[in-house]
Regions:
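Short, solvent-exposed loop/turn segments at secondary-structure junctions
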Residues: 94-96, 135-138, 161, 198-201, ...
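Aromatic (often tryptophan-rich) hydrophobic motifs at membrane interfaces
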Residues: 117, 228-342
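Membrane-proximal basic amphipathic "stem/tether" segments
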Residues: 1-26, 330-386
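Short, high-confidence coil segments that cap the C-terminus of an alpha-helix
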Residues: 74, 123-128, 246, 300-303
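A short, internal acetyl-CoA/4′-phosphopantetheine-binding micro-motif in the GNAT/acyltransferase core
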Residues: 102-112, 275-283
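N-terminal accessory beta-strand-rich subdomains and adjacent acidic, glycine-rich linkers
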Residues: 88-90, 101-103
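Acyl-donor-binding surface of acyltransferase catalytic domains
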Residues: 1-23, 109-192
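A conserved beta-strand-loop-helix scaffold within acyl/acetyltransferase catalytic domains
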Residues: 13-83, 91-96, 145-149, 167-282, ...
Length: 386
């Protein structure tokens, strides 16, 4: 924590590339948290801690290295408590803003407060701190800030065995899985589900599988009037992530691939990067079956959680995934600075209102069919205007 230090104390705490601060004068919840900065550097201990603490591919340095978000090496903040690393955040300083690059992680409010105090003490020119996709264990209460929910990450907490997982599913879900599994086996005697370690599969074979699954996904979405696609760069990034300890599941009828899943391991968790099935086999609920079998593979591999990422699909909740809200969060240096940033404040408020309206409409569509019709008409009108 930061001791509201004078400049002389700040200077004395610089140790090479790192800057360490300890504070006993702030809120009791922050007592004992020590901050360390590494300017434009990411030490090995931070890379390892990112995976161990958050278990999210979008919080990992490996993923960040594959994106276009790194014009330069980020600055690393490490939070210690009792000599142990309890939090790591990577960020860039852009003019008077700190942009946090670490995403899809769940933080305690005291961690966010410790980071805020340390950053504002370390960087005099910074007036605001921005998180793009963060989950909080509890709402923030200290200091001027704005946030809005824009998506969810669906997460399954995995038991020790597949039998325990199966027994925890709802009765109707178990019946659905058993019934459709038997049906697809009965109608296609050569049907199999195979699991591989990704590093055992040649890159060209894995690339072809990704393209095949992408075609299934594209055709399935097209039938519902939606679009999706992966660029060559997206596929290349996925290959790198999958190759490092990933699991690959493939559904076959003889030599014909009809479904599959791709999951990469991050810490103790698996993140489902891709799961799709042939739309021509929709009558067998093969998409849901592929996801279920992939989750079972993660359990066999000893994982703690399986992240199904965003997208509100009924099968996710049927498979016991629980949504973790993702927030866009802006923290201001002071109430005065917030008042001096009207465009930012208005922009956050307007965007938050738009997402809340969108969520309300999605919920109402299940009860008011005319809203679904209105949405389709609006989409057609927007397409025609383009």
């Amino acid at each position: 924590m930061v001791r509201t230090p004078g400049r002389s104390l700040v200077s004395s705490l610089r140790i090479g590339p790192a800057w360490i601060s300890s504070n006993i004068t702030l809120h009791d919840d922050l007592k004992g948290i020590v901050s360390e900065f590494h300017d434009r550097a990411v030490p090995k201990c931070a890379i390892d801690a990112l995976e161990k603490l958050y278990g999210s591919v979008y919080a990992s340095f490996a993923h960040l290295n594959l994106t276009d978000a790194l014009p330069q090496l980020p600055t690393t903040w490490i939070g210690y408590e009792g000599g142990e690393i309890i939090a790591v955040l990577l960020f860039l300083v852009r003019f008077d803003q700190v942009v946090v690059l670490t995403e899809l992680m769940c933080l305690e409010p005291r961690i966010v407060d410790a980071f805020r105090h340390a950053v504002l003490a370390r960087f005099d020119s910074v007036n605001s701190i921005h998180f793009n996709a963060v989950s909080l264990t509890q709402p923030l209460t200290a200091g001027p800030q704005q946030s809005y929910a824009f998506s969810e990450n669906y997460i399954i907490t995995l038991p020790r065995s597949v039998d325990l997982y199966r027994s925890a599913l709802g009765k109707s879900t178990r019946k659905t899985i058993k019934g459709y599994s038997n049906r697809v086996q009965r109608d296609f005697s050569a049907f199999v589900w195979e699991t591989y370690q990704a590093n055992q599969i040649p890159s060209h074979t894995l690339r072809a599988l990704i393209r095949q699954l992408q075609n299934f996904k594209r055709d399935g979405l097209a039938a519902r009037g939606k679009r999706a696609g992966l660029s060559r760069r997206d596929i290349a990034r996925m290959l790198v992530l999958i190759k490092a300890g990933g699991l690959v599941g493939v559904a076959r009828v003889g030599e014909r691939i009809c479904g599959g899943s791709l999951a990469c391991r991050v810490g103790d968790n698996y993140v489902m990067l891709f799961s799709a099935a042939d739309p021509s086999m929709a009558a067998y609920r093969l998409g849901m079956l592929c996801c279920f079998w992939a989750v079972c593979d993660c359990i066999h591999a000893g994982a703690r959680e399986c992240h199904l990422l965003w997208g509100r699909y009924q099968y996710k909740t049927q498979l016991l995934a629980r949504p973790r809200t993702l927030l866009r969060l802006t923290i201001y240096r002071s109430w005065l600075q917030m008042c001096l940033s009207p465009l930012m404040v208005i922009g956050m408020s307007a965007t938050g209102a738009r997402f809340r309206l969108r969520r309300w409409l999605l919920l109402k569509q299940h009860h008011e069919p005319w809203l679904s019709w209105l949405k389709k008409m609006s989409q057609r009108a927007a397409s025609w205007l383009r």
